Amino acid sequence: MFRLRQVALVAHDLDAVVGQLCETFGLSICFHDPGVAEFGLHNALMVIGDQFLEVVSPTEDGTTAGRLLEKRQGDGGYMAIYECGDLDGRMAHLAEHDVRVVWAGDFPTIRGRHLH
């Protein structure tokens, strides 16, 4: 199993972008993840079918998201989040293609990797 689970956007003004998305597409916020504070961000998640749309925005200077906003000179795509049934196998395949792991988390109910 390998599927797209979530698309994340990055924005200067979280509330404005989330408000526009909710109004335009009839969405509503389902969750704010306090865990993204670890990365200097705040966020909002919305459900679309069986997937999520997330918007993140920097809350401090020097974040990856903030640097991307500056480089692009505006809001845009930030990351795609996939779900897979065999993380170890997938990671071995990605290592063969020089994909870097920039963050790893192993928790009781979920394992995750941020890749570049």
Language model features with spans:
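Vicinal oxygen chelate
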Residues: R3-H12, A44-G49, E54, R67-H116
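Intrinsically disordered, low-complexity linker/loop segments enriched in Gly/Pro
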Residues: F25, G85, V102-W103
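An N-terminus-focused feature that recognizes amino-terminal "leader" regions
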Residues: M1-D50, S57-G62
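Short acidic/glycine-enriched loop/turn segments that link adjacent beta-strands
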Residues: A37-G40, G76, T109-R113
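Short, flexible helix-coil linker/hinge segments at the edges of structured domains or between repeats
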Residues: V55, D61-E70
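Beta-hairpin (beta-strand-turn-beta-strand) motif
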Residues: P58, E83-G85, D106
